[in-house]
């Protein structure tokens, strides 16, 4: 992987990630394909929304179908027939989400398989081995996602273990002679001093890119913005910056304004299945009765298949009838909305008009522009 920083405007960055499997223009949003599929979508449909790179889930793909099946296909790209770049998370967040059925120790995490109840063990080394079999273009280190809220002491101990796991992840990645990219993950909760220690430790180890983890886990938006403002300027300019698990459209805009290059989130796909649709002028909850006889398109400015061919009334009808086509059409639109938003941000940085783009984005949604301070 090669990262090229093409232009900046304020703290915002316009760049390009170059992989053997394709080029990703940044800032970029990665649709989430948890089980080797973006729910309800073919790879061709996902590509048609403008997606350049997908996120796969190491934890879930390890449990099902497993490494043996993946190796028989070649790798995850062959398995799911997506031949663009793929970033895989390490499984750390999913283990964190298991709550009471997992035990975190220095060597790794012991837990019960949520599918069949079997005892199972995941370590930094094992995560690197699984991601190697997946053929991930970007591999994420195995870390512990610091919970929120957490005291300074709890966040410190969690961050320190994540740093030790980062060293082990790097070592096993190198032993496997993996030639793809390996990203470190900055932890430390909402505490700036802990974020500093985490980043310094990761820089000492050395990675191809740096992710900001442990945000969007319940903390106030002000804390997220404060941490990004503090951390991003300290990440080397020539390395990509990835904000994990974020988020809402305004979170992407605010992340870009603070120097983030990459994002992922289940929000556009999950919300689509619940009839929660993002448009240029705000959210449309298509389930609401007022759309029953609305014969206008979902978003007059959107060029997606859904908006070009169907009315709000039809989408409302599909939702009320629980037709699977409704979820598919909604997903196509939401993914295209996110990619159009990212394209708009890239074009604005290219043109030096980011402030105007941001002002228009918030005005259309009838919201004030958040301060960068």
UniProtKB/Swiss-Prot annotation:
Annotated EC: 2.4.2.29
Catalytic site positions: 89, 264
One Pfam family of this chain: TGT
Enzyme class: transferase
CC terms in the record's Gene Ontology section: cytosol
Keywords: Glycosyltransferase, Metal-binding, Queuosine biosynthesis, Transferase, tRNA processing, Zinc
Residues involved in Zn(2+) binding: 302, 304, 307, 333
Protein name per its UniProtKB record: Queuine tRNA-ribosyltransferase
């Amino acid at each position: 992987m090669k990262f090229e920083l093409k232009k900046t405007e304020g703290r915002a960055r316009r760049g390009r990630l170059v992989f053997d499997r394709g080029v990703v223009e940044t800032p970029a949003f990665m649709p989430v394909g948890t089980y080797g599929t973006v729910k309800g979508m073919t790879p061709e449909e996902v590509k048609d929304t403008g997606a350049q790179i997908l996120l796969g889930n190491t934890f879930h793909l390890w449990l099902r179908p497993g490494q043996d099946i993946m190796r028989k296909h070649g790798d995850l790209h062959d398995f799911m027939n997506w031949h663009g770049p793929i970033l895989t998370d390490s499984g750390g967040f999913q283990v964190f989400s298991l709550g009471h059925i997992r035990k975190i120790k220095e060597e790794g995490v012991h837990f019960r398989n949520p599918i069949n109840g079997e005892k199972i063990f995941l370590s930094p080394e094992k995560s690197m081995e699984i991601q190697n079999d997946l053929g991930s273009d970007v591999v994420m280190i195995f870390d512990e996602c610091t919970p929120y809220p957490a005291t300074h002491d709890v966040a410190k101990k969690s961050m320190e273990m994540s740093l030790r796991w980062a060293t082990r992840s790097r070592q096993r990645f190198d032993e496997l002679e993996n030639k793809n990219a390996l990203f470190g993950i900055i932890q430390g909760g909402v505490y700036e001093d802990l974020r500093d220690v985490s980043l310094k430790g990761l820089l000492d180890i050395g990675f191809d890119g740096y992710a900001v983890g442990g945000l969007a886990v319940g903390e106030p938006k002000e804390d997220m913005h404060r941490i990004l403002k503090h951390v991003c300027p300290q990440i080397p300019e020539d390395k990509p910056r990835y904000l994990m698990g974020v988020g809402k459209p305004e979170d992407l805009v605010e992340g870009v304004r603070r120097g983030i290059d990459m994002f992922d989130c289940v929000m556009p796909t999950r919300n689509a299945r619940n009839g929660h649709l993002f448009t240029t002028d705000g959210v449309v909850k298509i389930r609401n009765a007022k759309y029953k006889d609305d014969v206008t398109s979902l978003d007059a400015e959107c060029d997606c298949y859904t908006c070009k061919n169907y009315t709000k009334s039809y989408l409302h009808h599909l939702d009320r009838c629980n037709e699977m086509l409704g979820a598919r059409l909604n997903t196509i639109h939401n993914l295209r909305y996110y990619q159009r938003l990212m394209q708009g941000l890239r074009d604005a940085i290219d043109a030096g008009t980011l402030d105007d783009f941001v002002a228009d984005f918030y005005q259309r949604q009838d919201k004030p522009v958040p301060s960068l301070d």
